């Protein structure tokens, strides 16, 4: 089982990366929180990896921190939640909010995460509430810091909208959120910053 990958980052998107390790390119699914922490393409990168075996393939899911990997493992322990939905959840809400929502029975906050219906959100709280009670989120979860340069504005806006749609938000809702962020001073900001602000808007 692959638990960690270290190598050259040869491709990155908001949902996956390809890492070259000794001439072999590994495609790794990632949540947005990991995307925010990635270095530039061509740089060395190391990710903690969860290996998911399917009938005809292997799915690798990568994280910048071991703590986030453990949170991912908690999510997929919930009946009905697979790796893709778990990644989607970790992309739609930061680790601190997720732990707080589960520990405090905040169903309304979980319902704002795309892909989590009422029954699934209730199941997450029911099955994980006791398990996260010992987590001190501010101390144990590594948070994201924006370190990326701004990119072309129009391309950035399109990429941001596309990323939100891929997370499960409706096209118009994604566009409205991005437009609001831009109108409130988001011009010339990096994709990372725009996405984080847009997710906060969508969570309101």
UniProtKB/Swiss-Prot annotation:
Region (Domain II): 65-143
Keywords: Cytoplasm, DNA damage, DNA recombination, DNA repair, DNA-binding
Subcellular location: Cytoplasm
Pfam families registered for this protein in UniProt: HHH_5, RuvA_C, RuvA_N
Region (Domain I): 1-64
Region (Domain III): 154-204
Annotated spans, Flexible linker: 144-154
GO molecular function terms attached to this record: ATP binding; four-way junction DNA binding; four-way junction helicase activity
InterPro entries, alphabetized: DNA_helicase_Holl-junc_RuvA_I (IPR013849), Hlx-hairpin-Hlx_DNA-bd_motif (IPR003583), NA-bd_OB-fold (IPR012340), RuvA (IPR000085), RuvA_2-like (IPR010994), RuvA_C (IPR011114), RuvA_C_sf (IPR036267)
First-listed, main subcellular location of the protein, grouped into a coarse class: cytoplasm
Any one GO cellular component localisation term in the record: cytoplasm
GO biological process annotation, one example: DNA repair
Function according to Swiss-Prot or TrEMBL: The RuvA-RuvB-RuvC complex processes Holliday junction (HJ) DNA during genetic recombination and DNA repair, while the RuvA-RuvB complex plays an important role in the rescue of blocked DNA replication forks via replication fork reversal (RFR). RuvA specifically binds to HJ cruciform DNA, conferring on it an open structure. The RuvB hexamer acts as an ATP-dependent pump, pulling dsDNA into and through the RuvAB complex. HJ branch migration allows RuvC to scan DNA until it finds its consensus sequence, where it cleaves and resolves the cruciform DNA.
Notes concerning its domains: Has three domains with a flexible linker between the domains II and III and assumes an 'L' shape. Domain III is highly mobile and contacts RuvB.
Family: Belongs to the RuvA family.
Complex and partners: Homotetramer. Forms an RuvA(8)-RuvB(12)-Holliday junction (HJ) complex. HJ DNA is sandwiched between 2 RuvA tetramers; dsDNA enters through RuvA and exits via RuvB. An RuvB hexamer assembles on each DNA strand where it exits the tetramer. Each RuvB hexamer is contacted by two RuvA subunits (via domain III) on 2 adjacent RuvB subunits; this complex drives branch migration. In the full resolvosome a probable DNA-RuvA(4)-RuvB(12)-RuvC(2) complex forms which resolves the HJ.
Name recorded for this polypeptide: Holliday junction branch migration complex subunit RuvA
Organism annotation: Syntrophus aciditrophicus (strain SB)
